[in-house]
Amino acid sequence: MYKRQVLLTETGYLKRMPVSEFEATSRGTRGKAGTRSQGEDAVKLFISCNDHDTLVLFSDRGVSYALPAYRVPQCSRAAKGTPVVQLLPIPREEAITTLIPVSEFSDDTDLVMLTRGGFIKRTRLSAFSNIRSNGLIAINLEEGDALTWVRLAVPGDSVLILSLIHI
């Protein structure tokens, strides 16, 4: 198993790169870009995983999708990547909001989900071990709401949620 970096852009492009693409630089140097921005596109999510991990992707509509990490095409840092809609049966109007790498779907780990409307849900990670190819509804949303945040949690973890109220 090889350690990889998986990157998702704001416009829905996904790519996998070896960790060796990101080597340490000396002090005072400019560093290296993780990707070339294509106009308005920016990096949305950047995670580390192994090739045999399962990537669980969550959409703004509350649907989860599973994709083996090795199925994400490996690219160079300069490459744009592959559109998620070419890898999974995701409707074009649906956007991926979270990407979780999973090595093992254990019963002692939970997923904590938060919606734009302030609803929170905790579900066992093992409930996502058999996601169908067309996805699995992770959370039912009210009209106008969207799934915005999903993280792994184990017993004893705390979640602090802040909200900005515009007056």
Please provide the spans of the model-predicted regions:
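Conserved structured catalytic cores and adjacent interaction surfaces
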Residues: V102-I165
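Hydrophobic core positions in small helical hairpin nucleic-acid-binding modules
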Residues: K3-S106
